[in-house]
């Protein structure tokens, strides 16, 4: 947390700044207090650029101000392919050039073109021409208009949300005049649907125009049947009076076509404005979610873990975008309904009310169905969130899952969640499909009932004009009823999604007042940097807060019920009352005495100390005593319950290393201006020069997501360099030395902490007590919650905790080492500094030579690690459709597909022929048949169409759900078994996108698109066949109209498809950035870089919207031009009818016109469905790729090569001529490695950074396969075994222990293979629980509300937060040791496993390892050499080769050995060796 507390910022200014808050009652603490001249300036802009015209957006949108060159390249470049299209011969062969700069690009023309061009969207033609010749590039698109940029849109939305917040608070103050401001902020909750109202106000003009267009489109479609009636009556009269002039009929024909044209124009503009609103709303809410997470409190982040936020942005916002495009239809629905009712009554008389009654009956049935759909959607969302959260956790920790062979366990967990999710989705889809089938069949059923009633009332009154005009009106209502369920269904999704998002936006935030209160008081001693006076701090009790919120909810619900049932419950305690009593007891217990050693660390009480400017303070203590918490308390990140903290100067906390997916340089300067001299000095003092030299592109090498190309020590030093590069007054360092070896640690201490930062106030939490003498004073934290501060000598005299810790440290050796260095320095005389630099340079050169192969093996030659986002080009391959169909039908394909085709044909035939049969009935075609014959068959065709339609939708739904389920699960299975090299080089956001947005598309959108496409295609074919049957000459026009249709569709798809894919790629960048920001939230807030990352997000969202806006416009362009084709089609038909070119009856004309005048809608619908299907098939394509084509590791199980259960019984490991590379084609990392490790031997592995230490572990676990040679364990070649059989026999304690959200029990034994007694025993043996305390711990139970606050920290049922955030790093390492004990393996690998624990705990762990794994083979990679000096043998690696391999004493005895030199630098002397033989 970075804060600045000084006189330069007045309290008034701070309060004014805190007003600039979005979507929350509270301000962001981390960005309010600042006077630092070296602040993050990469997203800054001058006040003079804040013009009301929006021109400042252009300046803010310059990528070079806050994006590195790699970021710009990623979002502005993609591969170029020439297009080969059907009509390429009509265009010139010249390939258009790609604009290279923004100046060469045209601004989005929507507000900069004439009315005619806007009316027909002609301004999009340049993009279509380019897209027809080659693949569209990001720079081909129109650049963002400031009025449509996310910055402008979000500013408007923010103002509306603040207005609603203030309005809500004002109401609360009026109801509770005694309430304090803090109570108002906490309790004034927004009304439901506030976010929706804010969005509607943001887009009020735009959305109002959409509603106007929707009403106009509905009105024109409602009046068109009246022209149809006139046309039929004209044909009827013309058949009787042959001499009638045809001009009147031609006028009717042209009038009908003009009405169709107006309808198509308004319909397309309605969709354009509403879809545009959907795209913009999604962008706004994406930014709102990210900005909220920057301000969210710890409890809010507990309630909304990263996986849940990701689910909001990827899934819910996509549904909201889709829903907003249909909602204006609801506003236009009453108008068309009124028009149709009036015209039906005019045509048919009061009898029309019968059919209208059927419509209203169906509407009320649909309300019940909507309630069911709502319930299924809410239930499905719960499982979707759980699945996405688990997938995110799995992907973040996939290496750990591979180490522990937990792939099957997590695959099963995900499969179980997915099965439950699919169950709800299936029920929702079936309910929705029944509703759609009913809505589409309702007009036919209503017309059937109406005509039957009309016949009974008036047996002879069947005029063709009235009948078919009414049928057209019913068909218009059919179209409306088709869209109504979609509008309401998507509206339900939108309301649910916005409700979930509103709960996030209302979540509690960091208290900004805590930062303001840290300003020094008047009279503050200027010599002090920090002072604490009677301060108490505590971490939030998440479980208690959850219980309180639950009780509030129950009380609120019960209060509503009691209003209705007050008499029945009078005098009886309610459930909420009991809950409140239990909560009171919890709060009392919580404040009672407790043994901090046995429970979770909660906080500090009554802290009193001060720190002077320039002091170097060390904080130490046993693990779990709150060292990191004390730093957070100083930084203002921990909740203060009492006292006063005063900070005088800029303060920066350097916490757990977070590495951004960017170059090394960008990670170090982190948004500050680049100063080469300062940068080089920072790199030197942080001991990074040698590491940068070995990287292919030096400090411009892309590190890769999650720092995949770096060791733990390198990540720690880059994290340190980032903080040092910032110019601050007070530095808080959280164990920055734990991940580096003693030599590097000493260099950092000398050159950085006590060198470059010598004049700064430095506070270091550490276990490295060998350097404690360098501290001005030391703060020792005790297991009883006490804090003791003093000089080292003072504390040695009185503090038993420090005395115990020092007994395990190498302090005395360090003194000897310093004495030796003093002698050397004296001999060197005047060469002091120059000689040290030269020596360091030589050491770094050696390190460069030794580690070049190792590290370069992880990086491709140009310095990039992340693979480029895959973007398909041209049409979807048939293979994808084949794989999708295979997943959909399984073994029933020979039945399901033919049956579906039969049902589609049957539905179309019955639907169309019911109208034909109505014409037969109207003209009494079969003279000798009774009316019951016509009525019976008409009824049959109507109800058969309904039954066939239901069957068709049900089968398609079943197939779509099955395909989505199995493709997702197969992709999950494959990603769990893909090599680490793929995971390391693929951004997490991209992978997660496959299991969020792509999966959601298959669950909810693809089936709908396929249904639309198949049904509308069948309808169009049916209408064309009908026209040819009645008007044979029309067959001549069909090829010409087909060519025009294909011409338009081909031009559209050439660009529309590519721009949609481009939008998907740009969307992935937005999601990648969001995931990265969520993962590095603490670091970003500490460096006050929120604005920079929000600016980067704005840039990426704008790039996404440049494509997204065009996707919308292209759909409308093609819609209008297809309308023209359909109008030409209709004009030919109507002219053939009115001119009597063929002798057809008026009733037959009525049938033709009823369907021909629907053609514009049918053509638009099918093209939209085809396009949407192809877009959704892109999601299927990506999932199919993951499900079938991801690279796989070697066989997970080999039944024919399963070793005996007792293998390995000895633990002997032999490396024979082993060569190892991280990926095929990359340099060899381990070279010709030959080792023979005997059964039960304890091998210590050491070497400089990049020497290949951790690579041995990768080779043993076969994370990648050997390039040459073999590894034998108990004479079994491990390459012949299945990975499951190999890895489950190995145990590892990694450097970065991982905990999964859940309980300790699930983290130790996710398969439930062990008994509780075995797990308790492992916790005791691992040192997590004292043996004497075990009986008491076993008896502990959660309290009445299910909270675990009073239980032992390592109780099996103790809750584990996401990424184990409620456990310290040392505690997580104890649990990693316990995991290894649970596995009961014969071979144990320690990868710098005790780097983050104090020396006492380190000693205890080493002792337990010796005791518990005494008969096991141990390979220990360590930078604390003292932990391995008494191992059986030491392996020293250099350049991936064996440099030395012998007993520790033998190597130490050799004056020129590498091991001897390393021991000397670590202060290890002869007395440290127990075995000197």
Curated annotation (Swiss-Prot):
Residues 36-48, 581-595 have a biased composition (Basic and acidic residues). Residues 1-206, 271-328, 371-433, 500-615, 914-940, 1049-1117, 1163-1477 are cytoplasmic. The chain crosses the membrane at residues 207-227, 250-270, 329-349, 358-370, 434-454, 479-499, 616-636, 893-913, 941-961, 1028-1048, 1118-1138, 1142-1162. Gene3D superfamilies: ABC transporter type 1, transmembrane domain, P-loop containing nucleotide triphosphate hydrolases. GO terms for biological process: transmembrane transport; xenobiotic transport. Keywords: ATP-binding, Cell membrane, Glycoprotein, Membrane, Nucleotide-binding, Phosphoprotein, Repeat, Translocase, Transmembrane, Transmembrane helix, Transport. ATP 1 binds at residues 621-628. Residues 207-493, 897-1175 form the ABC transmembrane type-1 domain. It comes from the Eukaryota. It catalyses: a 1,2-diacyl-sn-glycero-3-phosphoethanolamine(in) + ATP + H2O = a 1,2-diacyl-sn-glycero-3-phosphoethanolamine(out) + ADP + phosphate + H(+); Cd(2+)(in) + ATP + H2O = Cd(2+)(out) + ADP + phosphate + H(+); an S-substituted glutathione(in) + ATP + H2O = an S-substituted glutathione(out) + ADP + phosphate + H(+). It is found in: Cell membrane. The modification Phosphothreonine is found at residue 53. A motif (Diacidic ER export motif DxE) lies at residues 71-73. Functions as a pleiotropic drug pump at the plasma membrane to clear toxic substances from the cytosol. Organic anion transporter involved in the detoxification of a wide range of toxic environmental organic anions that contain carboxyl groups. Required for tolerance to reveromycin A, tautomycin and leptomycin B. Required for oligomycin resistance. Required for rhodamine B resistance. Mediates the ATP-dependent efflux of rhodamine B. Involved in cadmium detoxification. This is Oligomycin resistance ATP-dependent permease YOR1. The lineage of its organism: Eukaryota, Fungi, Dikarya, Ascomycota, Saccharomycotina.
